[in-house]
Amino acid sequence: MKLNALWIAAIASLAMAGCNKAESPAEVQHDTAAAQADAQRDMADATADAREDNADAAKDVNDAVADNDADDAADQAQDASETAAKGEYKVAVAAAEANHKVAVEKCEALSGNAQDDCKNRADSDLDNAKRQAERRRDGTG
């Protein structure tokens, strides 16, 4: 029975040794470049979506103004303002997530506790950026 416990402990320690292991500089550079490329695509998509939504909202406002409907124009203007805030939020979150992806890949160059700390900082930065984006969207920041 003691032999089984020793084998289990040995296997567990070998498995744990592979965790938080630093990647080679070339591997980190490759992964970071890939994360940056993904981040640029994500940012471009979020920005394009926000622009499209804002253009649609502006068209609705212009249509209401052209119809000489003051109440509808006011409603559409409010909707356009909310659409702009949502778009800014989406872009800010995309930027935060993009920065997070790149930061986490850079953390892979570290090992052990330094890697854990680096990833925890990246996670914390992401959470803070998302909260800040929410406050701006909601008009409280």
Predicted regions mapped to residue ranges:
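Bacterial N-terminal signal peptides that target proteins for export
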Residues: 1-7
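Bacterial Sec-type N-terminal signal peptides, specifically the leucine/valine-rich hydrophobic h-region
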Residues: 13-16
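Bacterial signal peptide processing site
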Residues: 18-23
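Juxtamembrane extracytosolic/periplasmic "stalk" immediately C-terminal to the first targeting helix
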Residues: 27-35
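Surface-exposed, polar/charged faces of alpha-helical domains
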Residues: 42, 46-49, 53-131, 135-141
